[in-house]
Amino acid sequence: VVLTGWAGQISLGQVGFVAIGAAVSAKCTSQWNVDLSLSLVIAAMAGGIAAFVVGLPALRLRGLYLAVVTLVFALSVTEWFLNDRFFSWIPDSRIKRLPLFGRINVDTPTRFYVYTLIVLVIVFIAVRGIRHSRTGRAILALRDNEKAAQSYAIPVIWVKLTAFTISGAVAGVAG
């Protein structure tokens, strides 16, 4: 929503950010016994950092070229970075869900569903807050007319990077 709908940038690489968020979150919960909520925050940071890194060279691209670059990123992440032949840091077994905050058990499907809905609502409220902020208005202005936004002293490069980063962070949480 942030990158395609608000910024008007076509990205086919969201699955790469989802995969990075999933791998980082799985590593945190399975091997380091990090709480699931904290691992979601770490996954969001990992997805945001990856999106920032992908966004840097893609700043000058638009349309089909941007879509191709982001698709190549997604394919390289899923085929190379997350391949256990090359990297052994990704857990390969089922991950046991630790209790939330050490108290709330989410092992049953119903409780995990409720937890997922709560996370969805939190992400929705956060993204909605960004949408109604100065940053959200700048992203929308960039989508409508990049030159007009630049004439109103909106830093186009930083706004594009912000849109990429927010989009990657949300995708990281989805992982």
PLM regions and their residue ranges:
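Transmembrane alpha-helices and adjacent helix-loop boundaries
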Residues: 1-175
